[in-house]
Regions:
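Hydrophobic h-region of N-terminal signal peptides that target proteins for export
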Residues: 8-18
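Catalytic glycan-binding domains that act on GlcNAc-containing polysaccharides
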Residues: 19-170
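Sec-dependent signal peptide recognition
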Residues: 1-8
Length: 170
């Protein structure tokens, strides 16, 4: 069902072809909104993860080998069907699928899900939110702060999603 919704929503994006070639930033924002909706996540959360992970740089590569907008590790990309970690849509789809999976795995605990996104689910399943790791706690706090800030701008984001899906309201 989610896949059909994504296909439908992406066909409704009026500037999809132009966006792919001419307006990469707009295409990235549209993909984030569409996949957030398809996976039942707040678009502001997806945007916050992208902002913190890569600063919206599709070619970002970490010193640990994570790549693309949502900084997917090779094994995570493979597990979630991402063929090209530098492809905007492929990376966002895989990253949002992974984030949604983590939120379910940690029974809605966003802090644990974000810690797992940063450090891997095995470590978080073993230790929880390891308060002795300033890097992990700092990451969770940073994404949470950006998420809260973006939620104050939510009405504008909802208008974008609604214009793409042909719905009204918020």
């Amino acid at each position: 069902m989610a896949k059909a919704l994504v296909v439908l929503l992406l066909t409704l994006v009026p500037a999809a072809h132009a966006a792919r070639s001419g307006d990469e930033g707009r295409w990235s924002v549209q993909c984030a909104a569409v996949y957030a909706s398809a996976y039942g996540l707040p678009v502001e959360l997806v945007d916050a993860v992208i902002q913190v992970e890569s600063g919206w740089n599709r070619y970002a590569v970490s010193n640990k080998g994570a790549a693309g907008l949502m900084q997917l590790m090779p094994a995570t990309a493979l597990r979630f069907g991402v063929r090209d970690r530098f492809d905007v849509e492929d990376n966002i789809r895989g990253g949002v699928a992974y984030l949604a999976w983590l939120i379910r795995l940690f029974q809605g605990d966003l802090r644990l899900a974000l810690a797992a996104y940063n450090a891997g689910e095995s470590l978080v399943l073993l230790r929880g939110l390891d308060l002795s790791s300033p890097e992990i706690v700092g990451y969770v706090d940073h994404v949470t702060q950006v998420y809260r800030a973006l939620r104050t701008q939510a009405p504008r984001k909802r208008e974008l999603v609604n214009s793409m899906s042909g719905t009204r309201g918020g």
